[in-house]
């Protein structure tokens, strides 16, 4: 069984006198910085000078400065900027100002695992990864609960890396919901696999194929959209709350029998073999090398040729109209 911690297992005392620099003030940076501040920690914000987030962070009551200055002043540098710029920001501003005994902290371990950042051996390397978006991290904290997180220590130079890791996890509220111990390697590989095979890639492809199957058989696109896309959230919510078996016990008998007997026909052993291939391409570095190459050549335009497939697909054209019915104030 995985090692776990609850809020009562952890003390903030080991990091009460330390300064934590949150690098970045996007969705996660905003939420985690404010939660830590509200928990009584000494938080500073490191940002690109003149960036859009500077004024917002100041308005929220934070002391804001350049990334370089924040790195100099902090004991723990908690890096929450987008993955693909972490390497360059580290090279330009963090690395030159990093000194012995500090900690580099992340909410996703890819930059260290794939050596986009080559950290020295005289600092701690830690990770606190809330399993939810920043908005939920803040919302659950304000509700006196939290968003569960997975935590890891890759390098414990000071002998106090776990105190730092668990302290931050407690301060952002995640320990209230529960913490699970992982490793940088495990977090990166499982996170990317989930995104590609299931949560984003697999789910989007499954829904699109189901929509096409109904429309090609002569059914109205609007009805197909409701049946295979809109209602998906109802099922996912049940699975998240009650588990897969709990979902089966809460749907109709017809849905239960049909799903139990036909589901394996749709997601068969061939699909599982393809999932194994996706996992192997993550594990052996194939995906990382492909992604880095694409990003270096094309930047964010690397998405365009793939996004265009969905932009022009009938499911999106129908979906925009259907969503207007349910969310008339929505601006997509």
Curated annotation (Swiss-Prot):
Binding site for Mg(2+) 2: 191, 227, 231
Cited Pfam families: KARI_C, KARI_N
Cofactor info, note text: Binds 2 magnesium ions per subunit.
UniProt keyword annotations, A-Z: Amino-acid biosynthesis, Branched-chain amino acid biosynthesis, Magnesium, Metal-binding, NADP, Oxidoreductase
GO terms (BP aspect): isoleucine biosynthetic process; L-valine biosynthetic process
The protein's Enzyme Commission number: 1.1.1.86
Binding-site positions, substrate: 252
Domain KARI C-terminal knotted as annotated: residue spans: 183-329
Pathway stated in the Swiss-Prot or TrEMBL entry: Amino-acid biosynthesis; L-isoleucine biosynthesis; L-isoleucine from 2-oxobutanoate: step 2/4; Amino-acid biosynthesis; L-valine biosynthesis; L-valine from pyruvate: step 2/4
Residues given in the record as NADP(+) binding sites: 25-28, 48, 53, 83-86, 134
Keyword presence, RNA-binding: no
HAMAP family: IlvC
Similarity-based family: Belongs to the ketol-acid reductoisomerase family.
Functional description taken from the UniProt entry: Involved in the biosynthesis of branched-chain amino acids (BCAA). Catalyzes an alkyl-migration followed by a ketol-acid reduction of (S)-2-acetolactate (S2AL) to yield (R)-2,3-dihydroxy-isovalerate. In the isomerase reaction, S2AL is rearranged via a Mg-dependent methyl migration to produce 3-hydroxy-3-methyl-2-ketobutyrate (HMKB). In the reductase reaction, this 2-ketoacid undergoes a metal-dependent reduction by NADPH to yield (R)-2,3-dihydroxy-isovalerate.
Name listed for the protein in its UniProt record: Ketol-acid reductoisomerase (NADP(+))
Organism from which the protein derives: Nitrosopumilus maritimus (strain SCM1)
Lineage: Archaea, Nitrososphaerota, Nitrososphaeria, Nitrosopumilales, Nitrosopumilaceae
Gene that encodes it: ilvC
